[in-house]
Amino acid sequence: GLIETLTAVDTTVLVIGAGQAGLSIAARLRQMDIDCLVVERNGRVGDNWRKRYQALVLHNQRTVNHLPYIQFPEVWPEYLPKDMVAGWFEYYVQALELNVWCSTEFVTASFDEKSGHWRAHLVCEGEERHLKPRHIIMATGVSAIPDRSPVEGLQDFKGVVMHSADYHSATPWV
């Protein structure tokens, strides 16, 4: 169904993150007829891939990266470029009619023992939203938030200091 029609009462499961894990669980829940909403902080499904460094490709073969129900096309490269993965994720959401809210930040949640539901606080395109799902699944990935721990002596280093999350291309150094 369309996201616009989804209400807090309708939401059985709230999935945080529209990457490979979040979309996979949403697809499985849909096949089980369990209402599910996926929220993604990026502006588009697949942006978690699109926004990474220019030369990124999957580090293992296409055949071990399939999502449930619809496999990557066999004619695609063995090691998929990031933009192909990103586009596939968007297609996957449309093909399986998954409910996804993009530009949505998960702020916090607390469990209400009395009702047996969560109280989830979201900000969707700048607007606060409150949902009451029965379950919340965190599918935020392993590298969603860069670790910028202090490094002793870093302030004395004369070269360029850059976190890998900020690297997009070698062009400035070529």
Placement of each model-derived feature along the sequence:
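Active-site acidic short loop of glycosyltransferases
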Residues: 11, 132-134, 159
